[in-house]
Amino acid sequence: MIPENTGPAAVIVLAAGAGTRMKSRTPKILHEIGGRSMVGHALLAARSIEPRQLAIVVRHERDLVAGHVAELDPSAAIVDQDEVPGTGRAVEVALQALDAKEELTGTVVVTYGDVPLLSGGLLAELVATHEREANAVTVLTAVLDDATGYGRILRGEDGTVTGIREHKDSTDEERLIREVNSGIYAFDAAVLREALGKVTTDNAQGEKYLTDVLGLAREAGGRVAAVVTADRWQVEGANDRVQLAALGAELNRRTVEAWMRAGVTVVDPSTTWIDSSVTLDEDVRLLPNTQLHGSTSVARDAVVGPDTTLTDVEVGEGATVIRTHGSGSVIGPRAAVGPFTYLRPGTVLGEKGKIGAFYETKNVTIGRGSKLSHLGYAGDAEIGEDTNIGCGNITANYDGEKKHRTVIGSGVRTGSNTVFVAPVTVGDGAYSGAGAVIRKDVPAGALALSIAAQRNTEGWVPANRPGSRSAELAQAAINNSSSTPASTEEGK
């Protein structure tokens, strides 16, 4: 059971690292999993425990990180780490910045911008334990099958934490310890402030270590304890793209499982990817190789997939979306899309409407019950209700300099391969013939035709393409036709 939220004095998120192992021009903490940056996940977890103040410490690619954080959480304090290296110094500059507003009293939580699976529930448990036990420091730890490379948690006979030993400094006996330091802490603000003033850079790395605060707190008579989580993923960080992919896969597994438990059918969880920001109703059905991103929402009884990717798409109740790539679009209730359909931003398909195979749409509103069944393009257009757009229709919306709009009314029927040269309006109930090129407005109820009568020039191919296979076959057919005797009564 998750303890009641206690609202700490502050949360400090450390995000100043360079992340060189990512081998990327993008700052490490801006890399995404589940449709959200790692630091975005960290900020959400921090905000969920309702701290009175929130600070994030930045340094590497400072402007990029600060700008991103400001978009996600405008009220978060952005603090620059100075030239003194180390996690202890990062926390110290953040504490000084927060104290400048109002001296902190109570609990200060320290976490990281590259630990994306850390939940608000686990942070709340850390804070509740820290305050209930009146600890000076409470460290979040995890038990790993393979603790290689991690700092080991040292405990006294009474179970209290006596220290943290880095792997490289551990004895063979200490390396058998499976409980490791996550680097996530709850501190008493006064203890933290005093201890940081005593932490030095007198070590091999020349850094101010936050872990030194634990020993200083114990020396001052404070109690140091731990909250142990069996869920190692919540304290795993991503230092390279291999770890990032592993965290992304685990987050997606949890997300998919949570939706299934909430009433969503996922036929193949291993090939289904759902961003953290997606919303799904009960009785949604997701078929294999489906990806849902951004603010996508899917209403009850809708079927999405297989082989479908939707980003920021609203899918209405009972709709079907098959083998479709869509973004920034709305699919109405009981509408049908696909297969092999490309919905570009601004597409709005009305209730019971249809956009079929090999269709591309952009900035188009399609009314209730209207159908664009196959092989065409509709862009910068408005189509009314109960209209049928024939195969191969195109709205020619671009004149080389500007885009223009096509308006097609309700109850319209268009022939195959009709081209609408925008700007143009087609009135309600109008028809167009196959192959029509509509350059002028069509009145309501009119039939629009734009092609001349068919004319056949006999013998053109043999005369103009001599020596070609077509000419040979044509000449043979002509000769055969001319040599066939006319029917007579005797021949019957």
Swiss-Prot record:
Predominant subcellular localization, coarse grouping: cytoplasm
Annotated catalytic residues: 374 (proton acceptor)
Chain segments carrying region Disordered: 460-492
Pfam families: NTP_transf_3
Binding sites annotated in the UniProt record for acetyl-CoA: 397-398, 416, 434
Cofactor: Mg(2+)
Places the protein is found: Cytoplasm
Binding site for UDP-N-acetyl-alpha-D-glucosamine: 14-17, 28, 81, 86-87, 112-114, 151, 166, 181, 239, 344, 362, 377, 388
Region (Linker): 242-262
Reaction(s) catalysed (UniProt annotation): alpha-D-glucosamine 1-phosphate + acetyl-CoA = N-acetyl-alpha-D-glucosamine 1-phosphate + CoA + H(+); N-acetyl-alpha-D-glucosamine 1-phosphate + UTP + H(+) = UDP-N-acetyl-alpha-D-glucosamine + diphosphate
Pathway: Nucleotide-sugar biosynthesis; UDP-N-acetyl-alpha-D-glucosamine biosynthesis; N-acetyl-alpha-D-glucosamine 1-phosphate from alpha-D-glucosamine 6-phosphate (route II): step 2/2; Nucleotide-sugar biosynthesis; UDP-N-acetyl-alpha-D-glucosamine biosynthesis; UDP-N-acetyl-alpha-D-glucosamine from N-acetyl-alpha-D-glucosamine 1-phosphate: step 1/1; Bacterial outer membrane biogenesis; LPS lipid A biosynthesis
Biased composition (Polar residues): 477-492
Task performed by this protein: Catalyzes the last two sequential reactions in the de novo biosynthetic pathway for UDP-N-acetylglucosamine (UDP-GlcNAc). The C-terminal domain catalyzes the transfer of acetyl group from acetyl coenzyme A to glucosamine-1-phosphate (GlcN-1-P) to produce N-acetylglucosamine-1-phosphate (GlcNAc-1-P), which is converted into UDP-GlcNAc by the transfer of uridine 5-monophosphate (from uridine 5-triphosphate), a reaction catalyzed by the N-terminal domain.
Protein name stated in the entry: Bifunctional protein GlmU
UniProt source species: Pseudarthrobacter chlorophenolicus (strain ATCC 700700 / DSM 12829 / CIP 107037 / JCM 12360 / KCTC 9906 / NCIMB 13794 / A6)
Classification lineage: Bacteria, Bacillati, Actinomycetota, Actinomycetes, Micrococcales
Gene: glmU
